Structures are given as structure tokens and as C-alpha cells.
């Protein structure tokens, strides 16, 4: 294992993220179908060593392990790792779990055949550091693959809305949804990879109404929880405005009791 005793200028920000995402587990039913799509996109097969970065409740890790891969999974949030271990146990698969940070991966260079992340690594405050770490632990010729939210579509627009109403990101931290722009992804991966491929997928989220979608998200997703916490105490009228705009966005993507949340899939080979 590699030492990660490095001073982190974003330690406070990451501590807030750790707390904010601690209630995410109920959303795993939404992220489970896209997990299989990412595993397919990455071409994961039996016998490969796979790292799932920012694994959450391990829907990707367990899916890969059920296909015979040797899986390691890492997340910043202990509460999500507790549920991740439960999921692996229920599925009857072995996953090597670690509490840790994508910007300081505790693994030696060139360890894994495949490195994946589903809607997780995008929250790292320094994209250049995160992607460098993901590529560092990947073997030459190995596959890096991830799922992200395009800024112009449903969840990207919700993130932009949240940025308007919520606390600002620390100086120098870019919006997570930039990872959903193929041009940005291409630039961030740069000359370290070849065979860069993009695809699209859709997360169909069952919901009775835009208000139901908002209610669930407010109770589970870190950025939304923070907005409600701050505005309910300081500016209830602005909270009402936020909720109205949120439901208006969701209504554009709601049909037949499903919210269509499209995402970007990326795959590349490390040179």
C-alpha cells in the first residue's frame, strides 16, 4: 500500500462532502441499472483487477465482482462503505473496500487492469489530481471508464441551479458537471490515453411528480441537503423559489412517472 500522508488544502471541503453524502444510500436503486451499463462499457471480465473509485454503495463494484473480476473499491464516506459491505455480503461476492480519497489513492502505480467511477470522481475538487491518480494506478494498456452528468441535460441543469442557490464552491474548484462535457474530458485525459470513446445512457428514475423527486433528493443528496439546511434557516422565501425552479426543470424530463436523467459514458486506454 502507498502512503497518503500528504497535506491537503481541501481537507475541510472534503470533510463537508463526507458528511453531505452520508445519506445517499437510498438512491442506490436508481444507480444500480447504470452500474451494469458502465461495467459493460468498460469491458470488465473475469480475472481482471478492477478499482471502483468513489464507489458509494458499491453498485458498480458488486456488479463487476459478480462477473468474476477481482474488485477493490474506495470511497470517502464511512456510511456509504458500510452499506457497500452489506451489498457485497448479500450478493455473496468479495470486494476489498477502503476508506479514502481519489486525490490520494493508497495503491501502488500500475496495479489495476480497469479503473472506473460512476458519478463519483466528479466531486473531487482538483480534476487534474483526481485523473492523474486514477491513471497512475492503472496499468499501461488498461482501461479507464466513467459515467458523468452532461451540463446541458437534466442533472447538469439541477447542479447549475444548486450552484445558484447554494454555498459557493471553494476558489479554484470547477463545477462537477464539466466532467459531462466531452471536450473537457478529452482535455483532462490529454495525451495519457488513446482510443477515447464516448457513449450515452439514461437513468430512468421512477417518481410520482416533480415534487416527489425533489423531496427524495433533498433528503439524500449532499448539495440539496445543504441548500435546504441553509435557506430554511436564513431565507425561506428563497428556498421556495429554489424548489419551484427545481420542479420546473424536473417536469421537462418527466414522462409516464419516470424522470429521464441522461448521462455520458467515457472509456479510454492508458498509453
Spans of features found by a protein language model:
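Conserved class I S-adenosyl-L-methionine
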Residues: 2-48, 59, 83, 87-90
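A short acidic, Gly/Pro-enriched loop at the edge of an enzyme's catalytic core
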Residues: 103-114
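A short SAM/SAH-binding and catalytic strip from SAM-dependent methyltransferases
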Residues: 113-127
Amino acid at each position: 500500500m502507498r502512503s497518503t500522508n500528504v497535506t491537503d488544502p481541501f481537507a475541510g471541503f472534503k470533510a463537508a462532502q463526507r458528511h453531505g453524502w452520508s445519506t445517499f444510500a437510498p438512491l442506490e436503486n436508481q444507480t444500480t441499472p447504470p452500474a451494469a451499463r458502465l461495467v459493460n462499457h468498460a469491458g470488465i471480465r473475469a480475472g481482471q483487477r478492477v478499482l471502483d473509485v468513489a464507489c458509494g454503495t458499491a453498485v458498480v463494484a458488486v456488479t463487476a465482482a459478480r462477473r468474476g473480476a477481482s474488485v477493490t473499491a474506495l470511497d470517502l464516506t464511512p456510511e456509504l462503505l458500510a452499506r457497500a459491505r452489506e451489498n457485497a455480503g448479500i450478493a455473496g461476492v468479495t470486494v476489498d473496500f477502503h476508506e479514502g480519497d481519489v486525490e490520494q489513492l493508497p495503491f501502488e502505480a500500475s496495479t489495476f487492469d480497469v479503473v472506473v467511477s460512476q458519478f463519483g470522481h466528479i466531486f473531487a475538487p482538483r480534476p487534474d489530481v483526481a485523473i492523474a491518480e486514477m491513471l497512475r494506478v492503472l496499468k499501461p494498456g488498461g482501461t479507464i471508464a466513467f459515467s458523468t452528468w452532461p451540463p446541458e441535460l437534466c442533472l447538469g441543469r439541477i447542479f447549475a441551479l444548486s450552484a445558484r442557490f447554494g454555498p459557493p464552491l471553494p476558489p479554484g474548484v470547477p463545477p462537477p458537471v464539466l466532467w459531462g462535457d466531452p471536450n473537457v474530458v478529452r482535455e483532462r485525459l490529454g495525451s495519457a490515453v488513446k482510443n477515447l470513446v464516448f457513449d450515452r445512457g439514461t437513468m430512468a428514475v421512477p417518481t410520482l411528480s416533480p415534487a416527489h423527486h425533489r423531496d427524495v433528493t433533498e433528503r439524500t443528496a449532499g448539495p440539496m441537503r445543504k441548500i435546504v439546511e441553509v435557506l430554511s434557516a436564513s431565507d425561506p422565501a428563497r428556498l421556495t423559489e429554489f424548489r419551484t425552479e427545481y420542479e420546473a426543470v424536473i417536469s421537462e424530463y418527466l414522462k409516464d412517472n419516470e424522470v429521464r436523467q441522461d448521462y455520458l459514458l467515457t472509456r479510454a486506454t492508458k498509453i
